[in-house]
């Protein structure tokens, strides 16, 4: 699920933190990819009749098709991926997972009903909601990656948290996931849309955490508190607290402890905190997740030459993929994994930290930019109001 409305807040308050670019801009970089999130996106890539891709025997192959060809595209562009798979979810997440399961059960019933009486759009909508990544999907994707020579890691719990560890240690350039909570786990850089298909023509979004914190004028603890208030995988949001209110509450009070105190002591009782709302435990999961350290043996990974005959046996003989396409893809994989060994020039230079004076100048510029945006918004609203109040036919 990730963090509700976080990207919107970053766009509005820290636009300089987001850089949109092409996949080829990341040539020569190593990237840790959230495997479970990627597999889910492959599974919902359904056909027009609302069905997943399957083999001749009826086995689902959407996850393998996506993993094979999207990974190939990544490697074609000189990127070296390492996939990270989810382990057991934290106990605090069980409530959210139970709700997801309930929603999927309800969607399955609605899907059956839509097939009988609904439109094609309704069938597809409910079909997407019933999708679930199974252990079998994960195991088949791991088998495929091994045959491709692409490394993977099993995280103890959350894949995003393990990706963040690798990024902080410099073992990879960035963590790649669609889940914005990757930033809460302290990943310096988050890449979004990396595993999207080329046909979607979505730019790769590169989000820098230090610029997010600078733009929001928050430290990491306040940022995590904001994300919890927005609604995360561990806790429901507080009813009636939207993104703008959440941001204002953290800015006004500085921490969730103070926000909770202010809400409870408000005589108007504008907001009600849910009875079971263990925000301190949720915060602890972001600050101290169950992860393997970057120097752990399980976090040692390397890229190997693909096992071409193994790929043919698995994808062609067992899953009915086209042999010509698989062999051609394996040849590209072999060639491009070698090309990706080339280093980027930036790897030879260390970034110079900004001085306090430079930080102050940047902060002032950012505040001036926000003031101009607010002023323009007010002027636009005023002009709109005046235009509405004018009788029709006048100029």
UniProtKB/Swiss-Prot annotation:
Residues 360-395 are annotated as: Disordered. Residues 122-253 are annotated as: I-domain. Its EC number is 3.1.-.-. It holds the Pfam family XPG_I. Mg(2+) 1 binds at residues 34, 86, 158, 160. Coiled coil: none annotated. Residues 1-104 are annotated as: N-domain. Belongs to the XPG/RAD2 endonuclease family. FEN1 subfamily. This is Flap endonuclease 1. The gene is FEN1.
């Amino acid at each position: 699920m990730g963090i509700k409305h976080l990207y919107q807040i970053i766009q509005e308050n820290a636009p300089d933190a987001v850089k949109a670019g092409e996949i080829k801009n990341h040539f020569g970089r190593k990237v840790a990819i959230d495997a479970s999130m990627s597999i889910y996106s492959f599974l919902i890539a359904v056909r027009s009749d609302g069905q997943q891709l399957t083999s001749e025997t009826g086995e689902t192959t959407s996850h393998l098709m996506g993993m094979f060809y999207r990974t190939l595209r990544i490697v074609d562009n000189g990127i070296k991926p390492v996939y990270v798979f989810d382990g057991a979810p934290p106990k605090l997440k069980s409530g959210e997972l139970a709700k997801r399961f309930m929603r999927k059960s309800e969607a399955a019933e609605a899907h059956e009903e839509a097939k009988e009486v609904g439109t094609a759009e309704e069938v597809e909508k409910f079909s997407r909601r019933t999708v679930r990544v199974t252990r079998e999907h994960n195991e088949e994707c791991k088998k495929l990656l091994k045959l491709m020579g692409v490394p993977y890691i099993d995280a103890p719990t959350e894949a995003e948290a393990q990706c963040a560890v690798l990024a902080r240690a410099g073992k990879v350039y960035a963590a790649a996931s669609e889940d914005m909570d990757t930033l809460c786990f302290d990943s310096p850089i988050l890449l979004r849309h990396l595993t999207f298909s080329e046909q979607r023509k979505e730019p790769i979004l590169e989000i820098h955490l230090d610029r997010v914190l600078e733009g929001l004028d928050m430290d990491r603890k306040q940022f995590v508190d904001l994300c919890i208030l927005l609604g995360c995988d561990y806790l429901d949001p507080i009813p009636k607290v939207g993104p703008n209110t959440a941001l204002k509450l953290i800015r006004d009070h500085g921490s969730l402890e103070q926000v909770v105190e202010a809400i409870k002591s408000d005589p108007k009782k504008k907001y009600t905190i849910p009875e079971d709302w263990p925000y301190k435990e949720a915060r602890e999961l972001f600050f101290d997740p169950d992860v393997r350290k970057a120097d752990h043996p399980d976090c040692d990974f390397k890229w190997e030459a693909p096992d071409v005959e193994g790929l043919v046996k698995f994808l062609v003989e067992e899953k009915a993929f086209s042999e010509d396409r698989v062999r051609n893809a394996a040849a590209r994989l072999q060639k491009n994994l070698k090309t990706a060994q080339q280093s980027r020039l930036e790897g030879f230079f260390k970034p110079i930290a900004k001085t306090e004076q430079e930080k102050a100048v940047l902060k002032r510029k950012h505040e001036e930019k926000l003031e101009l945006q607010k002023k323009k918004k007010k002027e636009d609203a005023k002009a709109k109001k005046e235009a509405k109040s004018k009788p029709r036919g006048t100029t």
